[in-house]
Amino acid sequence: AGRLVATDVHTISRLDDDYNQDFLAAADVLFMSDELLPIPPEAWAAEIMARYAPQVLVIGLGAQGALLAVQRDRFVGRFPAASVRPVVSTIGAGDALFSAFVHGFVRTGDPYHALRQAIVFSAYKIGVTSAADGFLNQTALDRLCQDVLI
């Protein structure tokens, strides 16, 4: 008790997905990709929030950014992608978005700020070839976020 449970189920196409059922039910922060969704992300988010009630849901939309749903505010909205440097490789983009969001959310408790920073972090990350490179520390991320409007 008292611990935040954050999980990324990656690609999912069914609310009753056997493999992900426990993850969906336990998550306070739930991430997924829009790649296999059978309905528009906003409709999917409404179903996820009604059935599983995570505090926060983020659906990665690739080059279109991300969709955020926040239970306490009854908010559902899209955040655009950021462009901070040329895209070299999108390998690790989703993991970068997830990890940066969790870091920001745990640090501030603000899912809106956390997602904006995570989008910038992920946009920076995809500007390198290797999945093991292209990371920013908090100071560098804060500085970069001042120059990027999301």
What are these regions (language model features)?
Residues 43-150:
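Conserved phosphate-binding/catalytic region of the ribokinase-like
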Residues 1-47, 64-65:
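Conserved beta-alpha-beta core of the PfkB/ribokinase-like small-molecule kinase fold
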